[in-house]
Amino acid sequence: MIFSILEHILTHISFSVVSIVLTIYFLTLVVNLDEIIGFFDSSDKGIVITFFGITGLLFTRWIYSGHFPLSNLYESLIFLSWAFSIIHMVSYFNKKHKNHLNAITAPSAIFIQGFATSGLLNKMPQSAILVPALQSQWLMMHVSMMILGYGALLCGSLLSIALLVITFRKVRPTFWKKNIKTKFLLNELFSFDVLYYINERNSILLQQNSNFSFSRNYYRYQLIEQLDFWSFRIISFGFIFLTVGILSGAVWANETWGSYWNWDPKETWAFITWTIFAIYLHIKTNRNVRGINSAIVASIGFLLIWICYFGVNLLGIGLHSYGSFTPN
């Protein structure tokens, strides 16, 4: 009874902190908060609080239920949110690349945690006795590796999607500061065509001289390089987790069903997802191939992960149907 109440309290605390952090992120998008010192950093600290809250929630549910909390969709979503929180904390303590990674990990952890605790899965939060197929020591090894792999691959894929958006985004040519009065005076002195010509010429000169580091294109290039750098490394870690998860699942399947591979829908989509990210890593080994090509492959992998993760849960068929939205 005590553990049940504690789990309920931790769930509400986590969701409340997530809601506050989400509000802060939305405010930073629509309101200029640069003058408020430490306001944006408070959202990062909120994710750290959420991490410890989710950790306590998982341990409490583990003790209360008597098994590792990865037996249904609700528990796997909580664990996935925990995985995103880990990545966020790594970037939080790595001040050099903090802004690049947190823009992906924080909202992801927020939305997943919010969805899991919002009441949409009202039939899932109640802990139940494990079905016979899950009563194995392989549960912790297999499912945790798969969820950690999903989390890392989703994060890396989102970085690749951000890379594509920034790469193909049209940048308006401009060389003056974004000041209303300045724009008004310039528009009064010059025609639009003359301004456009000067802007184009300025852009070319900035790319050719030694002061290229001060141009917008240079910082844009730096951001793209950083996104590609972190996307590759996070996906590499996710691929390792996914591989270990698939192999451990095959051993577990042989012990339970008498076969290493049964071409179950979950197994099939996991294999397709693994193949896509293997192609991604193969492309990255070729230095002559641009990062855009690998980013496109990772973007496809992003969709495949959600199909693999939610597909069987939506259909409720196959050997992995115990993780469907409607528990059996």
From Swiss-Prot:
One GO term of the biological process aspect: cytochrome complex assembly
Residue ranges that the Swiss-Prot or TrEMBL entry lists as coiled coil: none
Transmembrane segments: 13-33, 46-66, 73-93, 101-121, 146-166, 234-254, 263-283, 295-315
Superkingdom of the organism of origin: Eukaryota
Localisation: Plastid, Chloroplast thylakoid membrane
Family statement drawn from the similarity comment of this UniProt entry: Belongs to the CcmF/CycK/Ccl1/NrfE/CcsA family.
Role: Required during biogenesis of c-type cytochromes (cytochrome c6 and cytochrome f) at the step of heme attachment.
Protein name, UniProt field: Cytochrome c biogenesis protein CcsA
